[in-house]
Amino acid sequence: MATGTLAWDPFVGEHADADANSDTADDENLPTFYIGHHEFKRPLPVTEFVLRQAGDVGYDMLTSPITSPHFHSRVLSLISNHIAEISAIDSSDAPNKATPPAPIIPPLDPVDTPFTPSDTVSQLIAYSSPWIDLCSPDPLVANISRQVLNIEIAYASFCGVGNVIIPGPRTHNGGSGNNGLAQYARAIQEALAIASYINVSIHMPMYGVEDQTEMTGDLLPFSRYQSTTDTSKGENEIDLYENWDAWNLIRDVCKYNSRLSVALALPRQLPIESLQSRWFAEPLKLLTFTQSTFLKNKGGHPVLGKAHQNLLTRYMKLKNPPWLLLCDVGPIPGLDDPNQQISVADGYAPPSVVQDAPSPTPAEAEQARRNSTKSQTKSKDVAAHLIYLRYLQRNQPERTPIEKFGSGYQDYLQAPLQPLTDNLESVTYEVFEKDPVKYDWYERAIERALSDWVLQKKPTSSLSGAVVLAVAGSGRGPLVSRALKASQTTGVPIEVWAVEKNPNAYVLLQRHNKNVWNGVVNVVKTDMRAWKGPLRNAAGPIGQAVTTSSTTPATTHGKVDILVSELLGSFADNELSPECIDGVQHVLAPEHGISIPASYTAHLTPILAPRLHADISNRFSADEHATDTPYVVMFHAIDFLATAVPDHPQIQQAWEFSHPLPVKTLHIAEARRGGGVSGGGGGSMSGGDGANEHNTRYARLKFVCKDRGVVNGLAGYFEAVLYEGGGKAENKVELSTRPDTIDAKSKDMISWFPIFFPLKACISFLGLYYYELLTYE
């Protein structure tokens, strides 16, 4: 919460608080609400005194119209004169009745606008004229409306305004697919081109028609054409997705411009959760509240229903939380009398003021909405709505550890790692090592594998009877430490081999072996696929130094009982885990050897991700392969399109890999790699000699999308079985990144973000849609 003098920079969307003692704003565990005040008939101009008074009450920002009533009157006179001229021509007896072109609005005069370049302007959100009609079927009204918008946007940009709100398309001109909406979208596209640095927010209701304040001088009555209406719907029937369809067309015409966003008007009765989730995925700049959005509690104070509170909590967890705008809830207190005693919205309020009110039925909500448009009821406190929102801010739930960790990663595109090609830096290893869940689960898998090994009385591959365990791709050694701990916990002795190709990590592993592991680990620097197995010195004990000279006694290579690796990628196999484990399987004991992980599966689902699509589209100019590249992303502002119920996506398995491979499969692969006759001569359908043909996968998946939407790409996840459990289901150890199973299998795991496969051409669909996916690996 911010109090005191406003100091807001609209270009970066940050607010500076003059009151440095505001503990709520400094609390990193709670979201900060930036709350603005909007009046349809705000007294002009908005002076420094008005801004200061608003800041003293607790507002962070104010809106202001770009042009004045004088400009409005001038435009109306221009239209009236032009229509009169047309009428005179039509009523004359002249043989050639050529219709004159639409008049051109003269440039602004000082009396036409309250704005001038100054610090005050930089602290305002501009609101374009609501009396224009960009959707009008009348070419004259549409032309004049477009001129007004362009004049306002150009002048606001000149003055240094950073954010402009434009009223959404009027729905009285027909459905979302009509020509009027296309006109509106092109007008917005033109406005964005005129002002290269202004952020434009389209003010739209979540569904239905927004409460319209009666306007004197509306251009609608000037239309000489009857507007078309959608007669296919009943009088009281509402198409819940109609407004989203309109927004989708606008941003599609504007090519997902990063400066285009939504100012979403919240109704008194919230729609179904699937529509709430759809808007959650969109670039929300503001959430707007009118008096009709609020309920009245027993004390007569405005409060939000539980559903609105939950929605606000969810939306405020976005990477860039929307600002909140109170619309026509009363004037700013103290403007008429600076000495007036006013309440300050500091987040503290008596229980009677913030006591919840029962949620209304749909009929009650509609009646309240109609009543609110007829008469504005006054609250007991002129700042009551602001006081309540500040109370909600102070009482927001703290962010969870996962939310804190992911705050900088939400919807941020990252290239998948290539550990086989690149030698990772220490800081990269460190990030993954911060995830205790993954390593706890690996340790649990090793513990159960060791315990079952003893219970099942399996022979070991060492002369001492210790279970031989190798960590293939040891990195900085976290799995080695967990393996030693598992041995200590179970009391089962192990012989540990740490294999690592990264020469820099190899240095650290040797240091750990000396200072942390007491020299009990055998550290080997090599690519795991080239490793021949544990070194066995015919004349010496197990664990002899790895590096030998020509005078060293003859050595042999033994087998490994348990092979541990952490080569999984966000889509299971996308970091070549199958190829790497196949390449080292020759060292695994053929009869009793265990691979951890034992198997893993890849999973897919279609999603709407407009923010990610916009980001990738912006990269395309510099990187022509941007749309062909998969990205690792911590998904947040997305909408699952194939769902059984809201927020419960239908995610389908694409394919599976298991380890160890059957010996016969390995022999065929080796024969093909060596060009042997037994390997055949057909090669591979994906090219090459066919040695990796056994890792080729194919999937055909079908998804049912119930609601209208746009497929921007595919979300990819994986599940892995680290240890099968030795025949006991309760001993099974699994990992998952799927949002519907992660809590049951590996809650709070953060090592892997999902993967995003973008579509070069988005797929739009209306109503029930069957999305069929054909994919190869």
Model region roles, listed by residue range:
Residues A2-S426, E433-K434, K438, R444, ...:
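Class I SAM-binding transferase module
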Residues E443, E447-V454, L484:
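Generic structural signal for well-ordered alpha-helical scaffold segments
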Residues R476-V492:
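Conserved SAM-binding loop of SAM-dependent methyltransferases across substrates and taxa
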